[in-house]
Amino acid sequence: MSRLAGGAIALAAAGVGALGMAWWSRPATAPLSLPAPRAEVPATTIGSYGTRVSYPAGREPSLAAPGGTPLLVHSLLRVDRPMHFGDYVWNESGVPAEGDTRIRVDLSRQLMSVFRGGHEIGTAVILYGTDHKPTPTGTFPILARARLHQSTLYDAEMPYMLRLTNDGVAIHASAVRRGYATHGCVGIPEDFARRVFGTSARGDLVTITA
């Protein structure tokens, strides 16, 4: 289950515009590192995107959350095709409508995963910061939300903004293209950002790992 056919990145604005062309290599991503469910537990079909991999009660893996409570995973989306810059998958079929929303960002794999009640409902290829403007790691509560935020620091629009730090690091919609990076924010495709914005709330936890 490969979720990205890799590439290089270059500097782009914290919003959606380009600021420069400094090129270097970054690793390609890989799927979430979780144990496979027992063979006798079949995957459940959940719609046009394929199947959901479910874990039996008592055998669910957990994902560490530095500075926060580990996330117990009940099911994952099965993504059988490579994901490229700008790609995302969103599928809530078969997932309870109630449950805490948790967001995980894996910088090394360039992936975001959105969970509700321990079930993965969305995943996307992301942009993140440069060595000079890195994306911070740790677990952060969502401090503020704005459907359309105008950055005064970079004079750029940041649609569907979820602010994570007091110095302006946020998740927001961006042009997720090969060769682009951010000034420390997490950039995600706009339609995916709209869905994340709609399912998240102030105080929900976002874990970012290197």
Mark where each language-model region is.
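Exported/periplasmic cell-wall-interacting domains
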Residues: 2-51, 78-79, 86-100, 133-139, ...
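N-terminal, Lys/Arg-enriched amphipathic/low-complexity engagement segments
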Residues: 46-64, 72-73
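Short, compositionally biased leader-like segments
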Residues: 62-87
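Short, surface-exposed loop motifs enriched in S/T, G, D/E and P with embedded aromatic residues
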Residues: 71, 125-126, 142
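A structural motif detector for short, solvent-exposed N-terminal "entry" segments of globular domains
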Residues: 89-130
